[in-house]
UniProtKB/Swiss-Prot annotation:
This is 2-methoxy-6-polyprenyl-1,4-benzoquinol methylase, mitochondrial. The gene is COQ5. Residues 1-42 form a transit peptide. Component of a multi-subunit COQ enzyme complex, composed of at least COQ3, COQ4, COQ5, COQ6, COQ7 and COQ9. Interacts with PYURF; the interaction is direct, stabilizes COQ5 protein and associates PYURF with COQ enzyme complex. Methyltransferase required for the conversion of 2-decaprenyl-6-methoxy-1,4-benzoquinol (DDMQH2) to 2-decaprenyl-3-methyl-6-methoxy-1,4-benzoquinol (DMQH2). PROSITE patterns: SAM_MT_UBIE (PS51608), UBIE_1 (PS01183), UBIE_2 (PS01184). It is a peripheral membrane protein.
Length: 327
């Protein structure tokens, strides 16, 4: 398996070689390389450029998409239970912190990508509903002389308990969306919520549509992370915010060793016992190790056009929240 650096080098050399050959053709020069050998070299470089990783395995870009889909199709029904078991429930705190950092205002239009089971969407709806109710109470206290009829009229004018806020959950996996919809019905979430089947690399939304874009524990599964970031930038309104909660690199050597031991020796076993799927959770562990560091991912977000990009490491760097703005 080629190292990441060597793949990048081959990709760079391939681009340089192609430019050189085009230059020779424009000048009317002929290559001294035998035709068959030259063609084989270029084809080999193109093949390498189209390869990516699926955990620790090297696969074609096209193959990765199908493999990732199968992983989440397989684990969808046990996804939330496994999140609780693997993280000992700490993932709930991380997601609460994401909402605290988001601090959505009334009327916020949120796009939650790779949010199939609805964890972020439900937290958002709870948050904005609570904020709106507090606003209503403040307004009523300021109008204590109103009659009961006038108070009832005020409430009728405020039928939208979310204050105009909306969330769209977008996921590429039908099974994950199915689980999310079932949870929404069971927990009574109906208003201000929409479910859309879509690809993070090619979002089915117009430009400048959303105030906030979130993606939690999803972007490392995308084949072209740079393309997903560019799509996030495209669909956000000017002034909109990008927020990503994702596994990252542990910054404490002792905790890192313990984390590796737990990840590789315990998590796949839990996956087999609870979800009946060792391989999917082996991929999960490996995909975390292949994801860029906090600083590297920060650079990628900036390259996509975002400004004021920052990140906060949580639980010694096991996860990080990255934030950026579209200006």
């Amino acid at each position: 398996m080629a190292a990441p650096g060597s793949c990048a080098l081959w990709s760079y050399c391939g681009r340089g070689w192609s430019r050189a050959m085009r230059g020779c053709q424009l000048l009317g020069l002929r290559s001294s390389w035998p035709g068959d050998l030259l063609s084989a070299r270029l084809l080999s470089q193109e093949k390498r450029a189209a390869e990516t990783h699926f955990g620790f395995e090297t696969v074609s870009e096209e193959e990765k998409g199908g493999k990732v889909y199968q992983v989440f199709e397989s684990v969808a029904k046990k996804y939330d239970v496994m999140n609780d078991m693997m993280s000992l429930g700490i993932h709930r705190v991380w997601k609460d912190l994401l909402l605290w950092k988001m601090h959505p205002l009334p009327g916020t239009q949120l796009l939650d990508v790779a949010g199939g089971t609805g964890d972020i969407a439900f937290r958002f709806l709870n948050y904005v509903q609570s904020q709106h109710q507090r606003k209503q109470k403040r307004q009523l206290r300021a109008q204590q002389n109103l009659s009961w009829e006038e108070i009832a009229k005020e409430y009728q004018n405020e039928e939208d308990s979310l204050g105009g806020s909306r969330v769209v959950v977008c996921d590429i996996n039908k099974e994950m969306l199915k689980v999310g919809k079932q949870k929404a019905l069971a927990q009574g979430y109906r208003a201000g919520l929409a479910w859309v089947l879509g690809d993070a690399e090619e979002l089915p939304f117009d430009d400048d549509k959303f105030d906030i874009y979130t993606i939690a524990f999803g972007i490392r599964n995308v084949t072209h992370i740079d393309q997903a970031l560019q799509e996030a930038h495209r669909v956000l309104k000017p002034g909109g915010r990008f927020l990503c909660l994702e596994f990252s690199q542990v910054n404490n050597p002792l905790i890192s060793r313990l984390y590796d031991l737990y990840s590789f020796q315990v998590i796949p076993v839990l996956g087999e016992v609870i979800a009946g799927d060792w391989k999917s959770y082996q991929y999960l562990v490996e995909s975390i190790r292949r994801f860029p560091s906090q600083e590297e991912f920060k650079d990628m977000i900036e390259d996509a056009g975002f400004h004021k990009v920052t990140y906060e490491s949580l639980t010694s760097g096991i996860v990080a929240i990255h934030s950026g703005f579209k200006l």
